[in-house]
Amino acid sequence: MLFRSKYGVTVNAILPGWIATDTQPEHERLQGMKTPLGRSGKPEEIASAVAYLASPEAGYITGQSIVVDGGNSIIEERGW
């Protein structure tokens, strides 16, 4: 996608963690409770990250993977 960058196109990714929904299975809810924040994320929190990346304020951010997981990736890296 770098060839599109000259047109102002940015390409990023959101990597969500456990997200609470009406259909979230119990085992996923329990996994969310094990994150450093002690809960699953909210759909609105993912939407906020997407909205930011789509905003003019993020115009110089490209090629990034933004982790929105309540710190879960940190504890997984350390094997906690």
Where are these regions (language model features)?
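Conserved SDR Rossmann-fold cofactor-binding beta-strand/turn motif
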Residues: 10-20, 54, 67-69
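Short, small/polar-rich loop/turn modules that mediate ligand/substrate recognition or access, typified
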Residues: 5, 10, 61-63
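A glycine/serine/threonine-rich, flexible loop-to-helix segment
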Residues: 6, 13-35, 45, 75-80
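A conserved structural motif in NAD(P)-dependent oxidoreductases
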Residues: 35-46, 57
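Conserved functional loop/turn residues at catalytic and ligand-binding sites
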Residues: 8, 22, 39, 56-57
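Short C-terminal tail/terminal secondary-structure segment
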Residues: 62-80
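Short, small-residue-biased leader/transition segments that mark boundaries at the very start
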Residues: 1-2
